[in-house]
A protein has these predicted regions:
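Hydrophobic alpha-helical segments that drive targeting, anchoring, or assembly
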Residues: 1-88
Length: 91
């Protein structure tokens, strides 16, 4: 699962301190979005690999976890778009 290595890289790249201002907060959101995408990829690969080997409720739970991870990515994408619009209202 190379996606796990990519996820670990995204997580270790997160800043260890709070953002000092709007620009740093936006960078944090971008890195979190990347980590959320990687997490969704890990869950997708796990679901594909385990398909047919799990009881129905376990498969449903894994599917739901993947969907929630995708939703997290989308919410962070929306947050980043809002930051860009706030920074440059003409966009």
């Amino acid at each position: 699962m190379s996606e796990i290595q990519a996820l670990l890289g995204a997580l270790t790249g997160l800043p260890r301190t709070r953002p000092a201002g709007p620009a740093e907060a936006e960078v944090l959101l971008a890195r979190l979005r990347s980590a959320a995408a990687r997490w969704a990829d890990v869950l997708y690969e796990a679901h594909e690999g385990a398909y047919g080997h799990l009881p129905p409720r376990a498969e449903a739970a894994l599917t739901l976890a993947f969907r929630r991870a995708e939703e997290s990515y989308v919410e962070l994408e929306i947050a980043l778009r809002d930051c860009a619009e706030h920074r440059d209202p003409a966009r």
